[in-house]
Amino acid sequence: MPHDGHEPPQRIIRLIAVGAGITGLLLCAVVPLLPVKQTTATIRWPQSATRDGWVTQITAPLVSGTPRALDISIPCSAMATLPDSVGLVVSTLPSGGVDTGKSGLFVRANKNAVVVAFRDSVAAVAPRPAVAAGNCSVLHIWANTRGAGANFVGIPGAAGILTAEKKPQVGGIFTDLKVPVQPGLSAHIDIDTRFITAPTAIKKIAVGVGAAAVLIAILALSALDRRNRNGHRLINWRVSMAWLAQWRVILATPPRAGGASRIADGGVLATLLLWHIIGATSSDDGYNLTVARVSSEAGYLANYYRYFGATEAPFDWYFTVLAKLASVSTAGVWMRIPATLAGIACWLIINHWVLRRLGPGTGGLSTNRVAVLTAGAMFLAAWLPFNNGLRPEPLIALGVLFTWVLVERAIALRRLASAATAAVVAILTATLAPQGLIAIAALLTGARAITQTIRRRRTTDGLLAPLLVLAASLSLITLVVFHSQTLATVGESARIKYKVGPTIACYQDFLRYYFLTVESNADGSMTRRFPVLVLLLCMFGVLVVLLRRSRVPGLASGPTWRLIGTTATSLLLLTFTPTKWAIQFGALAGLTGTFGAIAAFAFARISLHTRRNLTVYITALLFVLAWATAGINGWFGVSNYGVPWFDIQPVIAGHPVTSIFLTLSILTGLLAGGQHFRLDYAKHTEVKDTRRNRFLATTPLVVVATTMVLCEVGSLAKGAVARYPLYTTAKANLAALRSGLAPSVCAMADDVLTEPDPNAGMLQPVPGQIFGPTGPLGGMNPIGFKPEGVNDDLKSDPVVSKPGLVNSDASPNKPNVTFSDSAGTAGGKGPVGVNGSHVALPFGLDPDRTPVMGSYGENTLAASATSAWYQLPLHWKESIADRPLVVVSAAGAIWSYKEDGNFIYGQSLKLQWGVTRPDGIIQPLAQVMPIDIGPQPAWRNLRFPLTWAPPEANVARVVAYDPNLSPDQWLAFTPPRVPVLQTLQQLLGSQTPVLMDIATAANFPCQRPFSEHLGIAELPQYRILPDHKQTAASSNLWQSSEAGGPFLFLQALLRTSTISTYLRDDWYRDWGSVEQYYRLVPADQAPEAVVKQGMITVPGWIRRGPIRALP
């Protein structure tokens, strides 16, 4: 190369790029292995003594289930103090928990032996007489990564070792020993805190210097770009202002689509802002919000609902952003700001860059009004149903688009710095979630053109500089993933998640598309089917057009082919995600909008060639609409409230919309077939290039997409307006905005009414009545109804859910059958009640004050009972706002009607109103049937709104009739009551620790999720559950103890009861339920353990054994 005055600066910049690239690459490579500061936590026992001087028990539910190591020593002399019959020497879980023997360590003594068992596997047995005689000195128990074992020191043959899989779950130390603190009595629990890490000084320096080196390398590469454009230096880089000017964004400004572009901007942005207020939430809003909220106390981003508390790394930086937002406010309208901003950014990129790149110049795609409007409509049709929540798909969609734009800029301007920046954006996108991997698709499809640029500049820049900078840019992934975690911890987290699942192999990715066709799930709704089907139609349609015609005038061939490649590669990369939820298609929303414009533009060109082409195009769209509308208009959770057709296919005038579109598609298909055969002999088949025909050729897709958008927005708007002032997401968002995000505005917690004490609202019989031996509830002469007439087994009917339900640990290829009942509603025996019943009562009803009558077992004659009259509250009409219901707790099969008029078969139970006349005689008034939200035959609260009562009514009674002799057809009931209610916010407040299930957490921003600290979970006092079906199909499965969810320690340490709840003025609604937790071992007997905190430095490759992730 000839020498000139510019060569030394060129060489210097090249050397800077090489040096910075090598530095960044090496530092990024070593960051995963660099040491971190790990917070340690240990528990030593005994910790204190009771008032009698005996050792106390302690409570310490470990998030990981098992400790890193456990060591317990019990003097044999202490064991000798236990009663001769049965006693608990020591255990790591209380005896009364659910299946605690299968999970914990239990050392039990009976009159013959002392048995040490890990997870129901016996490790050692010692004869009780030998222990009592003092033949052993101490019982030593241990569990670590090498195994679990026990040894009665001094007794031959009384020792044993089990495998490491028998390491016990620890929820504390529990014992029946009545001994003082003494030498030799000890327990040491080393909590597994491997994920609670912080970077050491050397790691911070490496991360900072590595990131700076990569940035310098990219800037140096950008300087080389400037000097190599057109073969000479563009500016004098020594001049400071000129040096700054070289980083300005230079964009071509071809003619635009005039007002259409502005209309599209206004329409899309206005719709996104409106959707931010009224739009549906996503299935993981509660999941991600809770992970973010507890991260500060936990010390890392822990998976709260599953996976034994494993870190969210390598996909954790987005949760860090959510945690920062949650520190300001947890209101949904605030937390969803990133998603809305991502949507706005996506559209602006599409309209103001992508379309210009795909079709510049006069007559090009970017100047076609219909194409621009189609892009906007298709973008909204893809964005609204998928990307309005806290899931990462909105940011992934933005990252995919931005990466493609930077790659195209690198190709168009031959600037390798843009390619390096695209690599950085792709890396950030890929670390949002597994499906973020699709961001590298644009890099792969643009790699060939970028390689050609590198080859062309080899003589001036060499190969080393650009390749090192690009490699360093890609290596930034290690800084994002391992900035505070290590290679070992991230690897362990991945191992646990793949071990626990659900994971579906890449060759089964067809299940993702199958889930779109499942009718009853929100993921198979028509609004989610439509954008995916249209994307596939557009992509393959454009592909056929380009293959057949090579190019379309006004459409840039290279960028279009790369866009097709990017989309196809993205769909291929999606196969490598471990889960196959249909909601992950939201990551393609930006590409869907772009393809809408390309398809409208390209199909308009070919549709003018023959009428057949236009007819085929319309047929394809009609078929897509038929397939899409075969799904329900369903949304997730509370977003369904008030939405038309949320659980059925859309219907117009009694006819399914899908049948209408299918019929039309068949007719147009037949027409297209006729037009095709007519081509063989017709003299003229080309469509005249008139304004009318151009309109017909260009508008089908924009009309269809706009209609779908209007349907989506209209559905949610209708629900918000028609239901007001009943609860909706829109109402909660508007209330939060009006209050300025005040913490006193608490969304659903302000509308859920609770009945903390159902006995307080119990109605009393009118004095002076005569009734039989069964009391006032049975009335004068009950036939077939008796106090014991309730089945012992009241488990509700099974819940059958279809495959593809998000956050459901069920089979992906067959229906899932599950059972779930609110605590205390599934039957059983209880203490003797006031009328001699042994029935276990639900909802906290006091058996000393609450009689029961039921017809179970009466299979020979028609059963009937009319209770005595019960006095309604005085001045009930004035207090109806605070006490709006009469409630009867009932079980069995009861006839009722849903809000839409559909009936539920059962036997008759009615409430009859009455009025006491001046002479003391009660005059019966109207009878009303109950509102019964189910499920049968479990205990539930039948609702009778007081607005149904005649104004003069002041008494009421229960009228039951069961003429059906089938053993499954019976009913039982308790006395009526007018509940004393308070809102859920008033009951729980904002400081009470609560377990909020995944589906409910985002709806209760004021409630505090129970915290995790130093690897120990805080025990919640309440649980907020979603509706019955969601609880059975999702919550109870995803949060299970086998999967490392919170049930791991909650079911072992707590018992539950259900609190009666109602959604204000929405009495037909099964909004969910609230359960109250009680410790099996009270806090005064087993206080929270005192934890000793420490700090150690751990190299990045040290694993220290696996976390036990087995059932």
UniProtKB/Swiss-Prot annotation:
Residues 804-831 are annotated as: Disordered. GO terms for biological process: Actinobacterium-type cell wall biogenesis; cell wall organization. GO terms for molecular function: arabinosyltransferase activity. It is found in: Cell membrane. Gene3D superfamilies: arabinofuranosyltransferase like domain (2.60.120.610), EmbC, C-terminal domain, subdomain 2 (2.60.120.940). Keywords: Cell membrane, Cell wall biogenesis/degradation, Glycosyltransferase, Membrane, Transferase, Transmembrane, Transmembrane helix. Belongs to the emb family. This is Probable arabinosyltransferase A. It comes from Mycobacterium leprae (strain TN). The gene is embA.
